[in-house]
């Protein structure tokens, strides 16, 4: 009986690290975080998305503090994904196609430091992939200017308030109107030549 219990414990504990290896994180800032969740949520291999704040000087910032533009935080989305099913390089492709990489003042109708675009690398491998992806996009000549999206080292990520999570699902009418009114879809179509993923 004791041998069976020990074997069961070894099997269970041995499986835990394998399960943990099937989860990785990516963090991208692309303007309004409401609009950055849907393109990633649709991808096979993405387990969850969380809207939040990163890169600032204040602990546990609120939406009001961040949108006032005085905390140094970016609105961002944290993506939990299974690297056996989707690679970080694919996440980068989706990120680029859902932002305006040549706008240094924010994204679409949202202007200010909190709405700038950035890739927050969690390790050296992500940094290398992000830098290579940015360089390739710049070199392609497809955009009407230089890519200004920064690749930064990830700092502490703070989840935004609950009412911001899955906003596009909870408030589909308001979300659709916001995207249209902000000019997000028309600018993405202009930049990339294809309708954006919503």
Where are these regions (language model features)?
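Flexible coil/turn and secondary-structure edge motifs
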Residues: 19-198
């Amino acid at each position: 009986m004791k041998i069976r219990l020990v074997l069961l414990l070894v099997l269970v504990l041995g499986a835990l690290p394998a399960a943990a290896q099937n989860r990785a994180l990516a963090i991208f800032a692309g303007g309004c975080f409401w609009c950055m969740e849907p393109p990633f949520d649709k991808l096979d291999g993405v387990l969850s998305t969380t809207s939040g704040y990163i890169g600032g000087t204040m602990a546990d910032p609120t939406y009001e503090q961040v949108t006032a533009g005085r905390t140094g935080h970016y609105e961002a989305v944290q993506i939990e994904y299974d690297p056996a099913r989707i690679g970080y390089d694919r996440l980068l492709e989706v990120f680029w196609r859902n932002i305006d990489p040549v706008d240094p003042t924010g994204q679409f109708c949202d202007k200010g430091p909190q709405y700038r675009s950035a890739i927050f690398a969690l390790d050296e491998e992500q940094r290398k992939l992000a830098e290579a992806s940015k360089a390739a996009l710049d070199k392609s000549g497809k955009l009407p200017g230089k890519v200004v999206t920064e690749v930064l080292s990830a700092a502490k990520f703070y989840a935004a308030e609950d009412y911001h999570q899955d906003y596009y699902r909870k408030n589909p009418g308001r979300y659709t109107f916001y995207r249209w009114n902000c000019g997000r879809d028309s600018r993405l179509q202009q930049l990339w030549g294809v309708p954006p993923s919503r």
